[in-house]
A protein has these predicted regions:
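A short, structured active-site edge motif that brings together acidic residues
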Residues: 5-19, 38-45, 72
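Conserved hydrophobic residue
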Residues: 3-4, 65
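Conserved H-loop
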Residues: 4-5, 88
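Active-site catalytic pocket residues across diverse enzymes, especially alpha/beta-hydrolases
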Residues: 1-2, 85
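Beta/alpha (TIM)-barrel catalytic core signal, keyed to glycine-rich beta->alpha loops juxtaposed to Asp/Glu
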Residues: 16, 44-221
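CE4/NodB-like, metal-dependent polysaccharide N-deacetylase domain
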Residues: 21-42, 58-62
């Protein structure tokens, strides 16, 4: 592509069914065709995740991974990691959006110097969320789309935000959010639409099942 590797940020995850496979990180590097991963996460608090976390710590020491983190872990599980780790997780990837802003979780993460990465940042594309009157009003005021207003809210909430996009025009629109700023009152108005609504329900049974599911990773090359 002509772009230096240092200019590209590669983030990926370890799947629970492979948590106890010592060579899985090396296999991941091979599949990605890279010498190192910028951010590696544990996908779910399933299976032997403490063992997998130790493997990630070793990968950091060996220069194969720059930073490590967690995905879909709750406070108790994160604390278990913190109590037993040598290298602290830098990021928690978890569902976060205006209907589920993760207020309490963010307080816990802030105390432990862990950043939140918002998964489902647009509420899984829920039109009810995206078309909330407050977003339509602010979109008209700032000359932006409702989606751009939501993404700007994430930025001002200090969330790392990862909206999915395949079309070039959508990618450009997603990053065209740094030439305006929501006021404190507008942020409060958005906070008022919190419904404590999740789109992903990680029941104990569902999470446990992930450790038994082995996707064909080689087939995904």
């Amino acid at each position: 592509s002509g772009i230096a590797r240092e200019e590209i940020f590669i983030e990926t995850k370890l799947w629970p069914a492979f948590y106890e496979e010592d060579d899985q990180i090396d296999k991941t590097l091979e599949r990605l065709g890279t010498g190192y991963i910028d951010l590696l996460l544990l996908h779910q608090p399933s299976g032997n995740y403490m063992y997998a976390y130790k493997l990630m710590e070793k990968a950091v020491k060996d220069g194969k991974v720059k930073a490590i983190g967690l995905s879909n872990f709750n406070e108790t599980q994160i604390q278990e990691i913190l109590d037993n780790c040598e290298i602290k997780p830098t990021v928690l990837q978890t569902e976060a959006h205006p209907y589920y802003p993760q207020t309490e979780m963010k307080k816990f993460l802030a105390k432990n110097d862990i950043k939140i990465q918002a998964w489902y940042p647009l509420g899984h594309g829920d039109s009810n969320l995206i078309n909330e009157p407050i977003f339509t009003k602010l979109a008209e005021k700032y000359g932006k789309s409702n989606v751009q207003i939501i993404l700007r809210w994430h930025i001002q909430e200090n969330n790392i935000v990862i909206p999915g996009a395949r079309l070039e025009e959508h990618i450009k629109a997603n990053i065209d959010i740094f030439n305006f700023e929501l006021t404190e009152d507008e942020m409060k108005q958005i906070a008022a639409i919190n419904k404590n609504k999740r789109y992903y329900e990680g029941t104990p049974e569902k999470v446990a099942s992930y450790a038994q599911m082995k996707p064909d990773l080689d087939g995904q090359k």
